[in-house]
Amino acid sequence: MAIINMTDLDLQNKRVLIREDLNVPVSDGVVTSDARLRASLPTIQLALKKGAAVMVMSHLGRPTEGEFNAEYSMQPVVDYLAKALDCPVRLVSDYLDGVDVNVGEVVVFENVRFNVGEGKNDEALSKKMAALCDVYVMDAFGTAHRAQASTHGVGVYAPIACAGPLLSQELDALGKALDNPARPMVAIVGGSKVSTKLTVLESLSTKVDQLVVGGGIANTFIAAAGYKVGKSLYEADLVEEAKRLVANARSRGGDIPVPTDVVVASEFSPTAAATLKSVADVTDSDMIFDIGPDSAEALAKIIEQAGTIVWNGPVGVFEFDQFGEGTKRIAQAIANSKAFSIAGGGDTLAAVDKYNIADKVSYISTGGGAFLEFLEGKELPAVAMLEKRGA
């Protein structure tokens, strides 16, 4: 990829505009989960070290475009960054007509979604943003799949457009996992619906040696194998699609195994009583919430022998401990594996945290939708723009 990297540029006395993904949960004016903010710090610190005047922008939440709403202000992020960087950080509300920023200083722009035209990648807005800087740095993998003014348009018109270290790491890790994977390659795809992950399943099924499905997705495959799923979440209209995916996998010498044992309950609640059953014994009143220990052990063996592991989605309702053993065993197997492993998606990251394996996963992707679209083989607009500007 012919992308210019920020690390290679001379930024001395340059006005540098960095698009980060600082979209974090905020409660009562305080950031409640700082993973994305922590991930952005090295890029901001590097720009300062290189002698730049630093401007940072991001979206936060989903405010009505073009309207200021204090609930979605970047102020809590500014407070956090000032502490973390140990230097004054200013919030700038009106920045489109010019910003006073000195070398060695950091300013944060107010929520980019307060600008009319952000979502539609408006040309006039993009040009105004581009005029603020000498160098534009795209460092927000989490929004790389969206062609918006702050992620795409600004980079088209900026004097120089480059990738920040965080984005570069992400693209390198995903490339390593997908373009030239160590074999055997195993993908674990969980989540509630086949429909939202169908293109991911199709794309991965042509690349991987073993595809593992979990969560509500697995229920549709269980139904496709001819078993009852009771009152479980599944998609009857996609049973034929599931059969086709299994047949395709088998024709290439692989498989998409369905669980042999499952954990069921009669209701979805934190206090629901869990019962272990053979998949053949599921009744009409059962709801499947996890894979059983035999299935988890079989999948763990597959994972432990892998050369590359891609994990997107839990295999059960792990938020409730009685339905978390399957996901826990999968997490342990990934942690114990010598394979190159990459995990992404919100629920997956929550599982990584819950089972304390973050330091055992080779790479944790910060992008939810962008991670999925990369797995689907789709072109990410922000990345395509950077390639064009680097050519």
Swiss-Prot record:
Q: What's in the GO CC field?
A: cytosol
Please give the Gene3D superfamilies that the UniProt record associates with this protein: Phosphoglycerate kinase, N-terminal domain
Give me the residues that bind ATP, please: 197, 319, 345-348
Q: Does the keyword ATP-binding apply?
A: yes
InterPro entries found in the cross-reference section: Phosphoglycerate_kinase, Phosphoglycerate_kinase_CS, Phosphoglycerate_kinase_N, Phosphoglycerate_kinase_sf
Q: Where does it live in the cell?
A: Cytoplasm
Q: Which family does it belong to?
A: Belongs to the phosphoglycerate kinase family.
The identity of this protein, by name, is Phosphoglycerate kinase
Recorded name of the encoding gene: pgk
